[in-house]
């Protein structure tokens, strides 16, 4: 995909909508925590009241998706079960219960008597969130945007159009009973609007794409607006020579089969050669019973009947019940493989060797590095963030699951009493005190 970046028409319907969100976001940013939390409770109540309406809209989307032969991983994201919707609603209330991310003083310093510097958190402004399927993302993103004082413009995939529109209408009904302006949260419905939205860097402060590798790379390559997200979720699980094999089997099954379409599901299993003969037949039987197709290197294929993996398999994010397996001679080889093929998302080791675990945790370069637990824990809700807008694999923060802290920035506030720089310059310059104060 490619897109020529051009100056948008200032009078287009989309530009007018985005400008309206920008203006309403300015009002939202002035509201106190009680007002924003009250709005979230109204949204949660509205979603509960509209539960059947939302599920019916999603059922219609799913029926259409089946007719259109939507691929399995996208369909898994699209389907909104009663429990998934209930979890999304619970997430709204959990976000409301989190500490206020705004107005937090991170630095408080006296530069001189009567000249006080503060660094205080504030909203980013307007978020543009573009996602494939995932109707529950509308709930998550709207709640995080409201809590963090940001406006939000959402664009879901066409496959989820009924679900997203019904959810957004419900959110607006809740906001109309609150102090938060409903116009601060908007939903786009036309695919053609994406390319224009990506050009609106004057009014949109951050783009958050959620979807396939190709989709995220398209967004990253076609906008001047900062992009938060990850294009790949190629996660590994390394089973060390000192692993508890029962733990390793349970963790492997969970990390691959609990939700194979998730970006934090493993795609490659690395096994130390010293335990491969004892471990691989057992884990392969469990995986195959769960419907997983196995693709292994020559050593793995000698131990267990499976397809021979190609070079491409080590670099593939399947998002499906497919797992590549490689037998490695030692921890160094596992680290090298991860460094070569990993996407910087989440990597895990299973071992009872504390030194090996410590080295893995220290040396692997990823947003999440785990010991003796499933990669599926890489999630904002499970981390206690309430919800997440996405996962970032960038080196600069925010990194990993992005919740409220990743949706605020800060400003420096300096309060004086007629102070001027000339006082602190020249031969008789007055010295700064630079005394830290309590925050």
Curated annotation (Swiss-Prot):
Q: In which pathway does it act?
A: Amino-acid biosynthesis; L-proline biosynthesis; L-glutamate 5-semialdehyde from L-glutamate: step 2/2
- Location(s), subcellular: Cytoplasm
Classification via CDD domains: ALDH_F18-19_ProA-GPR
Question: What Gene Ontology terms describe what this protein does at the molecular function level?
Answer: glutamate-5-semialdehyde dehydrogenase activity; NADP binding
Pfam families xrefs = Aldedh (PF00171)
Key word Amino-acid biosynthesis present:
yes
The record, for InterPro entries, names: Ald_DH/histidinol_DH, Ald_DH_C, Ald_DH_N, Aldehyde_DH_dom, G-glutamylP_reductase_CS, Glu-5-SA_DH, GPR_dom
GO terms under cellular component: cytoplasm
List, in alphabetical order, the GO biological process terms annotated in this UniProt record. L-proline biosynthetic process
Q: List the Gene3D superfamilies.
A: Aldehyde Dehydrogenase, Chain A, domain 1 (3.40.605.10), Aldehyde Dehydrogenase, Chain A, domain 2 (3.40.309.10)
Q: What are the EC numbers?
A: 1.2.1.41
Query: What UniProt keywords are attached to this protein's entry?
Result: Amino-acid biosynthesis, Cytoplasm, NADP, Oxidoreductase, Proline biosynthesis
Q: Which reaction does it catalyse?
A: L-glutamate 5-semialdehyde + phosphate + NADP(+) = L-glutamyl 5-phosphate + NADPH + H(+)
Functionally, this protein is described as follows: Catalyzes the NADPH-dependent reduction of L-glutamate 5-phosphate into L-glutamate 5-semialdehyde and phosphate. The product spontaneously undergoes cyclization to form 1-pyrroline-5-carboxylate.
Task: Return the PANTHER family for the record.
Answer: DELTA-1-PYRROLINE-5-CARBOXYLATE SYNTHASE, GLUTAMATE SEMIALDEHYDE DEHYDROGENASE
Family according to the record? Belongs to the gamma-glutamyl phosphate reductase family.
Protein name, as recorded? Gamma-glutamyl phosphate reductase
- Tell me the organism: Thermosynechococcus vestitus (strain NIES-2133 / IAM M-273 / BP-1)
Gene that produces this protein: proA
């Amino acid at each position: 995909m490619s897109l020529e970046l051009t100056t948008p028409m200032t009078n287009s319907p989309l530009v007018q909508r985005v400008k309206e969100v920008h203006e309403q976001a300015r009002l939202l940013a002035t509201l106190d925590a009680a007002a924003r939390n009250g709005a979230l409770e109204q949204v949660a109540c509205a979603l509960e009241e509209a539960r059947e309406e939302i599920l019916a809209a999603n059922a219609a989307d799913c029926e259409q998706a089946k007719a259109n032969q939507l691929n399995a991983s996208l369909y898994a994201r699209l389907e909104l079960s009663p429990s998934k919707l209930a979890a999304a609603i619970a997430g709204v209330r959990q976000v409301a219960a989190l500490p206020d991310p705004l107005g937090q003083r991170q630095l408080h310093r006296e530069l001189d008597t009567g000249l006080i510097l503060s660094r205080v958190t504030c909203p980013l402004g307007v978020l543009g969130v573009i996602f494939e399927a995932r109707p529950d993302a509308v709930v998550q993103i709207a709640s995080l945007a409201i809590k963090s004082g940001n406006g939000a413009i959402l664009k879901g995939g066409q496959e989820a159009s009924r679900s997203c529109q019904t959810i957004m209408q419900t959110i607006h009904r809740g906001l109309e009973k609150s102090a938060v302006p409903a116009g601060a949260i908007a939903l786009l419905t036309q695919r053609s609007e994406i390319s224009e939205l990506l050009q609106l860097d004057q009014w949109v402060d951050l783009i958050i794409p959620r979807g396939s590798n190709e989709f995220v790379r398209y967004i990253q390559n076609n906008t001047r607006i900062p992009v938060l997200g990850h294009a790949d979720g190629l996660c590994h699980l390394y089973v060390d020579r000192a692993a508890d094999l029962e733990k390793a089997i349970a963790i492997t099954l969970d990390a691959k089969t609990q939700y194979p379409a998730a970006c934090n599901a493993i795609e490659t299993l690395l096994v130390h050669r010293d335990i491969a003969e004892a471990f691989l037949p057992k884990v392969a039987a469990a995986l195959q019973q769960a419907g997983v197709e196995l693709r292994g290197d020559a050593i793995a294929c000698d131990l267990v009947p499976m397809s021979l993996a190609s070079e491409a398999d080590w670099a593939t994010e399947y998002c499906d019940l497919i797992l590549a397996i490689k037998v490695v001679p030692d921890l160094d080889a596992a680290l090298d493989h991860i460094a070569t093929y990993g996407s910087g998302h989440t990597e895990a080791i299973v071992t009872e060797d504390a030194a090996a675990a410590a080295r893995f945790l220290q040396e692997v370069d990823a947003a999440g590095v785990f010991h003796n637990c499933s990669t599926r824990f890489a999630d904002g809700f499970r981390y206690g963030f309430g919800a997440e807008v996405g996962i970032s694999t960038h080196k600069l923060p925010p990194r990993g699951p992005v919740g409220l802290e990743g949706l605020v920035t800060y400003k420096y506030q300096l309060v004086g009493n007629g102070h001027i720089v000339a006082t602190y310059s020249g031969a008789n310059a007055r010295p700064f005190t630079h005394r830290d104060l309590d925050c």
